[in-house]
Amino acid sequence: AKNAKEIESPTGMALSGEVEDFLTQVTFPPKGERKETTGVQGAKQTATVAFTAQGMSKYSRTENAVIDESVAPVMIDNKTKQVVTPGADGYYAVAGQGKYKITAKGTDVDVEFIPEDNFVGTADGISIRRTDNNGYTTDWLSKDKVALPSINEVLDNMDGLYIPTVTPKELEGEDKTSTDVQGASQTGTPEFALEGTNSNGEKVKITPDFDYPAKFVSPTTGKVINDPVLTVEGEGIYYLDDLTGKVTFVPEPGFTGTAKGVTVSLTAPVGRDKNKQVQSEFIKTATAKYTPTVTPATISSTNKVSEDVQNVPQTQTPTFDLSN
């Protein structure tokens, strides 16, 4: 080009000229990681979700972008898809499932999940969002989902995703005993609980109800029976309140000593999933025994005396008392 017109409106082919290099600076937003954990019912679960910055820093031709550690990670409820603010204790609770806590660990984020005592199954989980030093967040969508699919399938973006699963515990029974005097009725309530303890070191009770009643186990067949009245020859009659598991024992008048007792069985769900449903694998069975002891009654007599003048009839009643 030798004149202004050729420079402004070039046509044809130039056989000579200058070429200038131009360095294009490309920036990319950061992305998170998908993490899953599995733990037993009531136990705390933990994980670390990694975050990766991509591309170059906006104001540098030599420095790579990094996760901005001065910007706190953000928690998002996967059910509501809304950013949430944890409570004063740092936890955010999802009703019917459990509570979450996130803590920045350099560029990554530590996650803690404490399930509710009666929650089992896969939780909705949470999403975690971070920001890089270019001001970009992980809340972005790939234009080519085949080549670069979303990391977070819940929000359909690149936020970090954490999903915990809680497996059901077994059910265990606790035997009960009682003692009373000969002829007196006695009661005892065998109890049922999840094996072990929850994250606070407490036993979690499972009680009978209308849908899952307690039942006697036949002492002869060893099988569960539907009859709430059980007679044991030579001992007495046992009555079961199937909605509470309480057993009432009415001994035979002449029975003393420790009875053979009865076994109570409970088949019930140890928890429910995030939709409040009971899955077949959540239903467990345990047995517990109730054993009454009857102490023999003794009869003690009290002599009586009377006094009056000659030829006047006198009366008095000696007394007899039962005691153990």
Question: Positions of the model-derived regions?
Answer:
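Acidic, turn/loop-rich segments in luminal/extracellular domains of secretory-pathway
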Residues: 1, 88-158, 224-286
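A broad "non-catalytic interaction surface" signal
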Residues: 1-29, 51-63
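Short amphipathic alpha-helical surface micro-motifs
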Residues: 4-8, 230-231, 299-301
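Sparse, context-dependent recognition of short Cys/His-centered cofactor- or disulfide-binding micro-motifs
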Residues: 7-9, 175, 240
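Intrinsically disordered, low-complexity boundary segments flanking structured domains
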Residues: 8-12, 86-88, 149, 201
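Solvent-exposed loop and beta-edge segments used for protein-protein assembly and interaction
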Residues: 16-18, 41-43, 105-107, 120-122, ...
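Extracellular interdomain linkers/hinges and stalk-like, low-complexity segments
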Residues: 27-66, 131-207, 265-324
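Surface-exposed or secretory-pathway low-complexity segments enriched in glycine-proline
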Residues: 44-110, 114, 185-244, 286-290, ...
